[in-house]
């Protein structure tokens, strides 16, 4: 897998990784990394996974921020990470309504399939910036638990229509990647998902 980033002077820097050379020991990866609370082996495993994801997702690295697009991520999840059922859903083109959108989220989370979710903040809409984060649960009130990827800061339960940690509100241009499960866990899927009643 090849990608390209830029150096501090804006010059292109190619990056290549052979994902066949990587094996990941998920049992060594911790849920949280705080200074003095992890070994070199656990740090190496999560660093290797982060690097492989970054390169294969065609991450654009910068000194102030880094990013990629959800469509690049879903292609890589299917091709390189053993998630053949991964699928990208774009809320702006989703025609089945908000209730069905939310039922898809609840269904995925009820089956222990975390969601990669993305949105664009009001303050970044003009410039096109956004943020990707993980939904990993929901509560009885229909709020989703969000891991923002900011060292645990602001992680908690949020309304999907707001997604408003601190000064942000990632309610624009939302999309999500569903179906992140290994083939051995996968159930038979169809092209159209219809949810009726409560999930």
Please describe what each predicted stretch is.
Residues 38, 42-65, 104-113, 167-181:
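Short, Φ-rich (hydrophobic/aromatic) sequence segments
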Residues 110, 125-129, 138-197:
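Cys-His-centered catalytic/binding microenvironment captured across papain-like cysteine peptidases
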Residues 50-53, 67, 76, 116-119, ...:
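Generic detector of bulky aromatic hydrophobic side chains
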Residues 24, 28, 35, 40, ...:
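Intrinsically disordered, low-complexity regions enriched in small/polar residues
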Residues 1-94:
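Cysteine-nucleophile protease catalytic domains, especially the papain-like/related folds used
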Residues 25, 96-101, 157-159:
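General structural signal for secondary-structure boundaries
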Residues 75, 79-147:
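Active-site-adjacent substructure of cysteine-protease-like catalytic cores
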Residues 12, 38, 56, 64-66, ...:
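Compositionally biased, intrinsically disordered low-complexity regions
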């Amino acid at each position: 897998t090849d990608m390209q980033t830029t150096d501090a002077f804006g010059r292109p820097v190619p990056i290549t990784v052979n994902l066949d050379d990587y094996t990941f020991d998920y049992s060594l990866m911790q849920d949280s990394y705080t200074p003095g609370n992890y070994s070199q082996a656990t740090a190496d495993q999560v660093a290797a996974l982060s690097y492989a994801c970054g390169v294969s997702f065609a991450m654009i690295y910068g000194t102030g921020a880094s990013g990629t697009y959800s469509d690049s991520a879903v292609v890589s999840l299917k091709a390189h990470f053993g998630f053949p059922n991964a699928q990208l859903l774009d809320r702006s083109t989703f025609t089945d309504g908000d209730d069905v959108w939310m039922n898809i989220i609840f269904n995925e989370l009820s089956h222990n399939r975390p969601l990669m979710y993305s949105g664009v903040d009001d303050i970044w809409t003009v410039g096109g910036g956004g943020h990707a984060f993980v939904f990993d649960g929901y509560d009885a009130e229909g709020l989703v638990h969000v891991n923002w990827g900011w060292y645990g800061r602001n992680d908690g339960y949020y309304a999907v229509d707001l997604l408003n940690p601190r000064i942000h509100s990632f309610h624009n241009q939302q999309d999500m990647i569903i179906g992140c499960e290994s083939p051995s866990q996968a159930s038979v899927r169809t092209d159209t998902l219809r949810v009726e009643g409560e999930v």
